[in-house]
Amino acid sequence: YKQVVKKEKTPEGRMFWYLVAATIPGGAIGFLLDHFVGDALGKMPLVIASALIIMGIILYVADKKSPSKTKYEDMSFKQTFLIGLSQALAFIPGVSRSGVTMTTGRLMGVDRESTAKYTFLLSTPIVLGATLYKFKDFVFNIPFVVGVVASFITGLFVIKFLLEYLKK
């Protein structure tokens, strides 16, 4: 409580407020562009495939060429905010939210493990917000709800595995 709400200067408290600040632009842009970008571009396979390939190449280059200077606990507000802002690009079909945030973190010199940890923490508020926003559209779709729950559980295992893998 003291670390988070009272903003005591601990790494956990600081990172909590960084996550809050980094979530706002992605959420706002996503809310504003939801009907325009997703509906229009979502039906264009060439856009989706191109975005996926381009972002994959950019992530590969960023991971190989960027220095790994910054650890999780040393990330700055600027780094965390720009990583959060980059989430907005995920509204382009074919652009992975995790991929674009990992790319941004690596381009800013954050090491792999720290970028992955921050990316996964950052996913919680944005995914939860998007789920609540779209809740009315799928609340009575039982197969969809089962799929979401299964994806969540699987995702937790994958995140744990990936974080362990990135430590190596």
Stretches with model-predicted labels:
Residues Y1-S96, V100-K168:
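Multi-pass membrane proteins that catalyze or facilitate reactions on polyprenyl-/lipid-phosphate substrates
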